[in-house]
Amino acid sequence: MKKPVLLMILDGWGIAPADKTNAAAMAKTPNLDSYFANYPHTTLEASGKAVGLPAGQIGNSEVGHLNIGAGRIIYQSLTRIDKAIEDGDLYKNKELSRVMDETKQAGKALHLLGLLSDGGVHSHIEHLLALICMAKVKGLTKVYVHAFLDGRDVGPKTALEYIHELEDGMAQIGVGKIATVSGRYYAMDRDKRWERVERAYKALVLGEGGKAASAAAGVEASYAAGVTDEFVEPFTVDGVDGKITAGDGVIFFNFRPDRAREITRALHDEDFPYFARPEGARPVNYVCMTQYDATITAPVAFPPEEIKDTLGEVLAQHGLHQLRIAETEKYAHVTFFFNGGVEAPNANEERILIPSPKVATYDLQPEMSAEEVTQALLAELDKDKFDAIILNFANPDMVGHTGVLSAAITAMEKVDDCAGRIVRKVLSLGGSVCITADHGNLEKMAESDGSPNTAHTTNPVPFILVSEEQHKLHNGILADIAPTLLQLLNIKQPAAMTGKTLID
């Protein structure tokens, strides 16, 4: 009979002192409490440099699952680009150099578009300023910025700070003008709401939309109308003819793919059925900062790095059977991200997707689909089929994001109940359960002023090893989880995995 090793990821559960904002501590969790009391446990760093992000940067589910599945620190796009700027490699970047050189030779304009903030989730203003610097060094004189306003990864009314920082930077560097401004709601849609994308596109290509004397004046007018950064309607800046036309150079400096795809397709793709585009707007010399989609043919400045010997691959190499199971909200995380950004399953890797409930916000159903996930998993455990199981419970994170404390407490209590039933079953089979998380969230549901906190945290996450054998554990990082699981399965850790087992 197989003795399964199960990794249970309680998404969004960080460790923090018990207080009236810590939903995890306020919840009644008899099962988790008993594991902390009776089994070895430690904490893991899940943010900043420990997961390949800049120091102090909050972790997220994509980054967390990449690091867990890879068994090594995966340097995220933000860190890669930061490093390239620091080392001077950005200025030698093949695609960025090429597009700037060709644009200059053709006497055309260079357009830099992307999210204008230092949120570090989709983009960073420092990357934009570095590109403007590079354009100056390359001798380009027609450089236009198309600023997408944030208000989501940063405060809802912070755009003026970033506009002033950009304008000061351009003045110092000696090149660049803001040509258009649009809230990310329009320019960075990801839900195929093409009517939104079309409005941003028309500002970029036709100069249509609102008009303002300056970028700041347009934002101030929006504020006066009660419209915050994310929702600012696309407008052009008077006196700046920065329309994107055929033959121009275009660099989209966002590094996160999901919200960069639609506007990229509109500006770049030859076939585009979603709305009418004018003649003379294509082809442009387009460069994506990172790979937004394998089917987008535009050149990429920072192509993906291949991650070899992920946990899933190593299990497959040893002929082991593995199961990945989660509800919709976290299914991509236990499959695509856990496998190092690879869509196809490994040999003997089975997947179960449980639909997430169709509710407007998850505080309305904090249990989400945890019960259905649990029942499906218990049924699989009866089959004596799997050596390793990767399970994600979405509740702590998705309900944590709502900022509703009572709902987050309910979410945690439901997950505790499910965890108890799963652990009992695995122990009855002689297996082991590692309980952990990918980042913090629901342990901080409010700010010090009492306003809701809906964001992730930089808190460490727990790691509990529930098994018949008593082990000693030490502190670590998310990348140390895969080597630990391999040790429990008596499999040699591959050299590519630089994480270290948590077992002393």
Locations of regions flagged by a protein language model:
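Feature captures the catalytic ectodomains and active-site-proximal regions of enzymes
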Residues: M1-D504
